[in-house]
Amino acid sequence: MIDAKRTAAELSNMYHTNDPIDLADHLGVYTQVGPLGKIYGCCLTIAGERFIYINSDLDKSTQKMVAAHELGHAVMHQEDYFFFNWMPDSLHRNRAEIEAHTFAAELLVPDSVVLEHPGFTLSQLSALTGYAENFLKFKKVGGVL
C-alpha cells in the first residue's frame, strides 16, 4: 500500500503549497472544471498525459476535495490504472480509492489543525475546516483521529 500521507507531505513541502490545482500545475497534470452530471471528478491518462476533471456543479470546498483526491490518483496510481472517477458512493470501494482519499485528506488538512484542537470531534473539525466528516475520517494524526 502506498504511503499517501508521506506522498502528500513531500509534494506540499517540495512546492510550498497544499492547493491541489497549484500542485497539479507544478506536476504537469492538466485540470479542467466543467459539468460532469453525477460524477464528482475523474482522472485519466491519455498517451502519457494526465488530466483531472472536476464537476463545476459542486460547491468550492467539495471541488477542492475532489481535485485533491484526483491528484492523488494522478501521482500515486499512474502505472496501475488509466481512468478513475469519483462518485458519492465510491469512497471505500478499493485500495486505490482509499489511498486517493487519504492523500486528499492529508494534503488539505495539516496535522497542526488537528493537534491545535485536541478533543475536537469530527463534527467540530468539519465545521472548522469546511470539509465533510466522511472526508475527515481519512485524516490520521498520531492516534488523534
Residue ranges: model-predicted function:
Residues 1-145:
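Active-site hotspot residues in diverse enzymes, especially metal/ion-binding acidic/histidine motifs
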